[in-house]
Amino acid sequence: MCRLLGWVARERRSLRDVLGEESFVAFAQLSRIHADGWGVATADGAGLQGECSTSNAAADPVFRSVATNSTGQAGVAHLRWASPGLPVEPCNAHPFLHFRYAFAHNGGIYPFERLDEILTAEWQAKLQGTTDSERYFLAVLAEMERSNVDVVTALPRVLRRLTEEFTPSSLNAMMLGPEALYVVNCHDASLRPVLPPPEKQSVDELVEATEEEVPYYDLRYRRTDGTVVVASSGFAQPEGGGWRRIENNSLLVVDRATLEVTEIPLDVHIGLAVAADSAGADLR
């Protein structure tokens, strides 16, 4: 389980700059629980660069330096809370970078051990780590190559296969490419992970969410003068501050050239409580 943040701007900007100091501090503090690493990828034109770590972001001066000094016309940031059984290693830190794309995911896909089935041997050879998230990413790139289609076409095809053949808790993701920032909001809204106290960060359990809680998997975006920011829940995102909730089962596309925002409905639905009961998935 993780926290996602992405942006597109008319000019080069850093993570700290696009959030503002108060929201940046609040976002970084989410790593008290999402403490298994951080990553930031930034892009200008077709160029893409990134830095990742297995450290707790709030306690890592390198994170503060990267968040302040690494600038781009677009970017994606990630705070990791590792799923059980997936090692906390640099190769498993998000965002993953392959070719001209960066990708970060929040959620789990079960059964993990079957995920290699969605990749050919050629694409399996490109894997750098052991996560379900990187396999999800490479499946999208593979579909783009196989069918000669763009991200907007490939993503729904991969999402459909993942929901039909596997049991995901959430497929929420951000994919940054040369043309746009693509944000997938596709999750079981009836569930949330149990958030442990900061001193105990290894728990990863899903329970029914209550109506009083801000849903863990919610995503929102905000348009300001020359910048669009998209973020997971966890820090203040008031409607009065311009934040708008992204509908579940939708794909948000932020054009990097125009900053135009398009929300596309997805014919994909996750019902984890039902699927887990029938599939016997381990959702700890």
Predicted region positions:
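N-terminal segments that mediate ammonia production and transfer
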Residues: 1-103, 109-284
